Amino acid sequence: EKTEDSFYVSVQSKSATDIDQKGIAVCIADLVDLNIKKILKKIQKIEPYAEFQNLHILLDGALKTSLKVGNQKTIIKGDEKELLISLASVYAKVTRDTYMKKISKNPKYSQYGFEVHKGYGTLNHRRAIQRGGLSDEHRRSFCGRL
């Protein structure tokens, strides 16, 4: 009998406003559950009678899910230890960087240089915030000390 392994990834994000209002920990927990639910839906479309008890869910760092599905494993520094977590991490980063490049074309954000630093806390990004203030893409809870 031939078995086939599959790798599924889902990337979702929360707005800066959501993160500031609910807190980063709550938003991350919500996103972990949301992503797992989206992956389960993808699997059910491909295999309508899939049994999820054989599903292996790898979570990086201290991530946890409230969902009682599959065989879940949390791995500290998982992106250094598990190839699949590394791949998912790169996929998420590229997705975020692509989004930042896209919004950098909007005149509303042109002063921030998102196309260069993609929102990471570089010196040029911090200087742009000091010159122009925070935009709705900035987490005030994170940028408070600028």
State where each predicted segment sits.
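RNase H-like, Mg2+-dependent phosphodiesterase core
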Residues: 1-146
